[in-house]
């Protein structure tokens, strides 16, 4: 749930009734800082979709940053059931859009951590859409009830340590075998023509591409992942990320002289 709305209950409690949270959120963080003192490290996980930045404005950002040490930018779930066309859920380009949006609002780059997703997402596409020819930007099935906001079961996610749902197992096998990397959007994906399913996830190789393209380019302070246990039992994504973090440390390219990765 994000400050100032767009949460699970946004159809029942409209954003207009949560306007008060815009001013309350910095006050909450300030109270935490006062209670914990200046020596404790405070971070906040914040949305990666600009449409959810309702409480993060050029006015509130300075107040927020005066109380926290850094922000964990959730650059994943950038496609969800409220979307109506396919896109990468944790791609390079939409991650850059999130980082740039926070930079434009006044967040120092060294105070931002880029988020990695240690899980897979899938979405049902419209059977009448030409997703085979245009898998990115293709029309999805209706994934959310327009009246209630409830999940219609046309999208989902699971972790690497999870058992793949039986009804998705064959499609996911095809995704693993034939998935491809979109060099334009910067994301790994697969479109299953047999079941009209769009798959979006990071391979270890796709994940490491984000270091030069985002972390180094924007001179960010670090990285984090959601979540550690979700990469079990092989921890391939964790090893890939840790390898790049160590490389940055060894090359002296981090900004603030202190490793702050949460991996």
Model-inferred region functions:
Residues 2-165:
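Substrate-binding surface in catalytic domains of secreted glycosidases
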Residues 116-213, 239-262:
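Glycan-binding loop/region signatures in secreted carbohydrate-active enzymes
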Residues 1-48, 72, 194-257:
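Active-site and adjacent substrate-binding regions of carbohydrate-active enzymes
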């Amino acid at each position: 749930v994000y400050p100032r709305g767009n949460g699970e209950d946004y159809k029942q409690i409209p954003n207009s009734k949560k306007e008060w949270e815009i001013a309350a959120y910095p006050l909450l963080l300030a109270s935490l800082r006062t209670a914990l003192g200046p020596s404790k490290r405070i971070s906040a996980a914040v949305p990666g979709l600009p449409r959810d930045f309702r409480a993060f404005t050029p006015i509130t950002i300075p107040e927020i940053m005066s109380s926290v040490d850094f922000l964990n930018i959730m650059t994943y779930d950038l496609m969800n059931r409220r979307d109506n066309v396919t896109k990468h859920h944790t791609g390079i380009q939409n991650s850059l859009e999130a980082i740039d949006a926070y930079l434009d609002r006044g967040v120092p780059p060294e105070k931002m951590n880029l988020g990695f997703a240690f899980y897979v997402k899938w979405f049902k596409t419209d059977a009448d859409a030409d997703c085979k020819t245009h898998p990115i930007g293709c029309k999805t099935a209706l994934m959310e009830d327009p009246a209630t906001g409830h999940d219609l079961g046309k999208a989902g996610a699971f972790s690497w340590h999870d058992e793949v749902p039986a009804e998705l197992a064959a499609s996911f096998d095809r995704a693993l075998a034939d998935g491809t990397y979109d060099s334009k959007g910067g994301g790994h994906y697969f479109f299953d023509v047999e079941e009209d399913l769009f798959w979006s996830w990071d391979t270890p190789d796709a994940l490491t591409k984000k270091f030069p393209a985002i972390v180094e380019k924007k001179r960010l302070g670090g990285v984090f992942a959601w979540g550690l246990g979700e990469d079990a039992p092989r921890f391939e994504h964790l090893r890939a990320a840790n390898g790049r973090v160590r490389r940055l440390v060894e090359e002296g390219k981090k900004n603030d002289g202190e490793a702050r990765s949460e991996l």
